[in-house]
Amino acid sequence: MKALLATDGSPGAIEAAHKVLSLLHPDVKIDVMTVIPETENPMDTAGGMEGPVITVEEADQAHLIDERHGRLALRSTLDAVGASETSEMIEGPDAGRVLCRLAAERGVDLLIVGASDKGWFQRLVHGSVMEYVVHHSPCPVLVVRHAGSD
């Protein structure tokens, strides 16, 4: 059996990792993954504006911050559970779509996500990775709710 654990390094994601390790058989192969935003093209323009929205330097700096955050998310999740699972950081425009695509490509049997503490307005504006994955995953999804959420 193959499982894919999505993490953003948050307490909910780390709690999901702990729960999964206590529920699954030790022989299950668990891949830990985080998805970071794709690098913004500084030459893109905003509607009605002339010229680039951000400079090349700003785009590079933003990408470095995203990569640092991604590495930290993976490391904090693996360290918290004391696991030596394989981990990977992927770039993509939408984390939910990337996770579902990779689950299909890799023949994953179970996709694990933590439920975030986003309020209804944040979910409305930004969407929810968990909600997308639950509705579009090619395999069963285990959603672990953070103990501190309502």
Regions found by a protein language model. Give the residues of each.
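Small/aliphatic-rich secondary-structure junction motif
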Residues: 2-56, 85
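Solvent-exposed polar/charged
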Residues: 22, 104-105, 135
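Short secondary-structure boundary segments
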Residues: 34, 114-116, 145-146
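A short acidic, glycine-rich active-site loop
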Residues: 52-69
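Structural beta-alpha unit
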Residues: 76-111, 149-150
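Short, acidic/small-residue loops that bind anionic groups at enzyme active sites
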Residues: 136-146
